[in-house]
Regions:
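Short coil/loop residues immediately preceding or within conserved phosphate-binding loops
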Residues: 7, 72, 108
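Cytochrome P450 core scaffold surrounding the K-helix E-X-X-R motif
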Residues: 49-55
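Glycine-rich beta-strand-centered segment in the early N-terminal region that forms part
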Residues: 28-45, 57-99
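Basic/polar N-terminal segments that are highly enriched at the extreme N-terminus
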Residues: 1-9, 14
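NAD(P)H dinucleotide-binding glycine-rich loop of Rossmann-like/cofactor-binding domains
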Residues: 86, 97-124
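Extracytoplasmic/periplasmic beta-strand context in beta-sandwich domains
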Residues: 25, 91, 108-109
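Short N-terminal binding/cap micro-motifs at the start of the first secondary-structure element
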Residues: 17-22, 48
Length: 124
């Protein structure tokens, strides 16, 4: 595993109240845990569940605040946690991660993602 303890930029939500804006913040970037890969995020989609979480109307998925929301991503693997054999540093991937129930979301420069939730980007 490559240790990458540093900071990254992220959009952080501090309140579910209507009219509350996301805050551009520097947050800690921990190394990936076992079974995870760290992805440098190139693109993050807006999934319908993201909108519901932001509005505070998806109690089954809402993280404790402050939180980084976002569930979908595309990017490149920059570090690999213990026990991950199907990916390598430099692999282009897409998939989903966090943004729900305390898992960091994709509205950030990087995310530590469960490797089972990712796929390799097709060559074509």
């Amino acid at each position: 595993m490559t240790a990458l303890n540093r900071q990254m930029r992220a959009l952080v939500l501090d309140s579910y109240e209507e009219g509350t804006a996301f805050r551009d913040a520097l947050i800690n970037l921990p190394s990936p845990s076992a079974g995870q890969v760290q992805v440098k995020i190139f693109a993050s989609g807006v999934n319908p569940i993201d909108y519901k979480i932001r509005q505070g109307i998806a109690p089954y998925a809402m993280p404790e605040l402050p939180a980084v929301l976002g569930t979908d991503l595309a990017g490149e693997i920059v570090a690999i946690g213990d026990g991950v054999a199907d990916f390598a540093v430099g692999d282009a991937v897409y998939g989903l991660t966090g943004g729900v129930r305390g898992l960091q979301g994709t509205l950030a420069e990087y995310a530590n993602v469960d490797a089972e939730l990712l796929a390799l980007k097709p060559k074509n």
